[in-house]
Amino acid sequence: MVLQLRLSLLRKVGFGAFALTVISAPPAHGQSTFASMGGAWSGNGMVHLRGGTQERIRCRASYDPSSSGQSLKLELRCASDAWNFDLSGSVVQNGNSISGTWFESVNRVGGRITGQYNGGLMEARAEGDIVAALLTVRTMGARQSFLMEAPGAWAEHVSIDLHR
């Protein structure tokens, strides 16, 4: 029973972990890390589930950077035809490193994210008690794309394109 509960939670959390990638974009030339991300974003993508099935997903994000641009609060909602989740989080930038926390309220799970950025590319690791995912994020003006790889999780591969 405990194993089944953990597997069910892992399936749900595996997808939720990717969402934090959106909050960790690197700075544009001459701008602080998160200042250019403020506002509302939306977009679509695909989630590849364990077992080989795929689903289209829709996401909406709201970002609130601090006045210094060195920290960011977010809210993110994503849904497919079969499920949805509601994520909140915060991230802080320190030199080339980023770190933060996230909480997904539908499944009541959370964790940490850590990583680094270089130019327009961010690479990070999102972790919770029972999930880990590798994340790659590119931000280019009013467009953002990201990729999550979480082998063994319910959502093993997620790709999403967002725009303002």
Feature map (PLM): residue ranges:
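Generic preference for hydrophobic/aromatic residues in regular secondary structure cores
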Residues: 1-4, 142, 164
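Bacterial N-terminal signal peptides
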Residues: 12-24
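Sec/Tat signal peptide C-region and signal peptidase I cleavage site
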Residues: 26-30
